[in-house]
């Protein structure tokens, strides 16, 4: 695997020898704006691989995206290879439907240490929950970013990542009550500890997420990509485009329902990916917000 091929894939052309916060943020933002958060392989009859070589082939060589275990594992490899001090962490995702964190460790997170300060770097949460900058590991501090305010809080040995969101304006009245819209301003995202993890510890989660009937990734075909202004999301046949802070403390969220025939073109033009197999778009009954 070639680190230069990774940098070419994300369009990063700046120096590689500066291991500071500015460079970390730059690399991170290049990845989230070029590598979609997506699970489309499942809905093309393929599996979601956790082997690094397979992930590199999928994302770098075939210009695809992946879900958190894949995109963050690739980011972990790239940052480590570049020379950053990294630690792989495991997260437990909050479910608003039952007001609980997952019992299984289903989210991979990257911690980066720079000059004695620790930062959480997560390129794999997608949608409007996606951080755009590393979040410093400080408890109780509001950390404003373009998408929202992020806040970490420490309780015992567990860290919790929360989000304070803006109001949202939906011009099309038909979608005002869409189940895809996040209704909460204050939203819990996930929790984690600082115990170092290995990729082998995520193998059962990788299997569960693509095989369990209770997995939202089996229930829905999802593709999400950050832009300089906001984020595009495709869930089933529903395409949304969010513009952050289009007016004071308000995001603009625009909806469009596609036909099956339009999906391939939208994936190519908006998300810059092409699928090798036929996609069966799906938006089942499980709760999922953009």
UniProtKB/Swiss-Prot annotation:
Family label: Belongs to the arylamine N-acetyltransferase family.
For the keyword Isomerase, the answer is no
Q: Which organism is it from?
A: Oryctolagus cuniculus (Rabbit)
Q: Where is the active site?
A: 68 (acyl-thioester intermediate), 107, 122
This molecule's function is given as:
Catalyzes the N- or O-acetylation of various arylamine and heterocyclic amine substrates, and participates in the detoxification of a plethora of hydrazine and arylamine drugs.
Protein name, as recorded: Arylamine N-acetyltransferase 2
Residues bound to CoA are: 103-104, 208, 214, 287
Q: Identify the keywords attached in UniProt to this record, alphabetized.
A: Acyltransferase, Cytoplasm, Transferase
């Amino acid at each position: 695997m070639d680190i230069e091929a990774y940098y070419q894939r994300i369009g990063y052309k700046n120096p590689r020898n500066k291991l500071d916060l500015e460079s970390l943020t730059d690399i991170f933002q290049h990845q989230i704006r070029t590598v979609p958060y997506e699970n489309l392989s499942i809905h093309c009859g393929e599996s979601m691989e956790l082997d690094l070589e397979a992930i590199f082939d999928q994302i770098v060589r075939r210009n695809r995206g992946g879900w958190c275990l894949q995109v963050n594992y690739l980011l972990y490899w790239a940052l480590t290879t570049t020379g950053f001090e990294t630690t792989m962490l495991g997260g437990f995702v909050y479910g608003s439907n039952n007001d609980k964190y997952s019992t299984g460790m289903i989210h991979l997170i990257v911690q980066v240490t720079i000059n004695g300060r620790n930062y959480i770097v997560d390129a794999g949460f997608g949608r409007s929950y996606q951080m755009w900058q590393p979040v410093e590991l400080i408890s109780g501090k509001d950390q404003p970013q373009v998408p929202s305010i992020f806040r970490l809080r420490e309780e015992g040995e567990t860290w919790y990542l929360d989000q304070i969101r803006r109001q949202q304006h939906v011009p099309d009245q038909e979608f005002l009550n869409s189940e895809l819209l996040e209704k909460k301003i204050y939203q819990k995202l996930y929790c984690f500890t600082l115990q170092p993890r290995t990729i082998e510890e995520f193998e059962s989660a990788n299997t569960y997420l693509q095989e369990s009937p209770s997995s939202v990734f089996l229930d829905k075909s999802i593709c999400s990509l950050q832009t300089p202004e906001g984020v595009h999301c495709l869930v089933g046949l529903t395409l949304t485009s969010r513009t952050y802070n289009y007016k004071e403390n308000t995001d603009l969220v625009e909806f469009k329902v596609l036909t099956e025939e339009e999906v391939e073109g939208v994936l190519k033009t908006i998300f810059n990916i092409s699928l090798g197999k036929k996609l069966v778009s799906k938006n089942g009954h499980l709760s999922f917000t953009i």
